[in-house]
């Protein structure tokens, strides 16, 4: 199945790169994790039945082939960016899927356009509540910008059995991310919008995937996230945090099964 690459200019003037793969009736809007890009989803996408799904994967601002800017690093702006990509890709409705830091951003999307979000999938996601991240960690990780080998070390810290080829692909793309973006996205996790999502009605169908051995955002964190979404389901996989380089096929299978339960 061929990839179609495109870009869109947001209403604040930032060019975002994205790609679509597949021509199925269900749109999956895919948001990558820290340092990643649309390519972070390649192994996941290869595991999907693309007669049933259409993957729309974007490079978050400051990452991949998107503009390297120093503005717009807020949860609302990132959600609006994702909607701009969905518009450009003609994905009127979609299931939003976010990995790691983007597990937080996909939680913001229903606050802006609940009628467009058919379901939410949070994969080892960051919570909508404020996290505690030492400034030294933020500084150290951001300082790795442009250094492929040092960036490759980060997912290894939190993975149990990563695929070396997928790690290499991650590192190639992570080297494109700007230093500002690498730091700013981490600082976004220090804020909270949890009160805005608690008790929202109607509830949007939600699936949460957790790595049993995730030392960063493990099962307890994922269960706390799920508690904000009545009727949500938590599935634990035998891996660490880095599901997209450890268990992409299994993650794709669970997402496909979840989407199969949604109204058509």
What is each stretch, according to the model?
Residues 14-68:
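Conserved HGGG/HGGXW glycine-rich cap/lid loop of the alpha/beta-hydrolase fold
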Residues 77-94:
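Conserved acidic catalytic loop of the alpha/beta-hydrolase fold
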Residues 98, 102, 106:
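Gly/Ala-rich beta-loop-alpha elbow adjacent to hydrolase catalytic centers
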Residues 107-112, 118-147:
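Flexible "cap/lid" loop of the alpha/beta hydrolase fold
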Residues 131-132, 147-200:
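Conserved alpha/beta-hydrolase catalytic His-Asp/Glu region
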Residues 202, 208-210:
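Short beta-strand/loop motif that positions the catalytic acidic residue
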Residues 212-217:
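Acidic catalytic loop of the alpha/beta-hydrolase fold
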Residues 239-252:
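Catalytic histidine-centered segment of alpha/beta-hydrolase-like enzymes
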């Amino acid at each position: 199945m061929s990839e179609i690459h495109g870009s869109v200019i947001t209403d604040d003037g930032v060019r975002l790169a994205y790609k679509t793969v597949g021509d199925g009736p269900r749109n999956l809007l895919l948001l990558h994790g820290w340092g990643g890009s649309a390519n972070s989803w390649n192994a996941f996408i290869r595991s999907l039945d693309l007669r049933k799904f259409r993957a729309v994967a974007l490079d978050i601002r400051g990452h991949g082939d998107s503009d390297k800017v120093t503005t717009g690093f807020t949860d609302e702006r990132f959600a609006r960016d994702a909607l701009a990509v969905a518009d450009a890709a003609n994905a009127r409705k979609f299931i939003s899927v976010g990995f790691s830091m983007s597990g937080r951003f996909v939680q913001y999307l229903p606050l802006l356009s609940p009628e467009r979000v058919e379901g939410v999938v949070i994969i080892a996601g960051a919570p909508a509540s404020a996290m505690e991240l030492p400034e030294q960690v933020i500084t150290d990780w951001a300082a790795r910008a442009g250094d492929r080998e040092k960036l490759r070390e980060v997912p290894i810290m939190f993975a149990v059995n990563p695929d070396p080829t997928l790690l290499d692909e991650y590192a190639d793309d992570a080297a494109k991310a700007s230093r500002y973006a690498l730091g700013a996205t981490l600082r976004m996790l220090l804020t909270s919008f949890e009160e805005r999502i608690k008790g929202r009605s109607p509830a949007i169908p939600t699936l949460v995937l957790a790595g049993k051995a995730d030392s960063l955002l493990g099962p307890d964190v994922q269960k706390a996230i799920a508690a904000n979404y009545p009727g949500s389901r938590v599935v634990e996989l035998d891996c660490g945090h880095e599901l997209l380089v450890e268990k992409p096929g299994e993650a794709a299978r669970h997402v496909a099964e979840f989407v199969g339960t949604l109204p058509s």
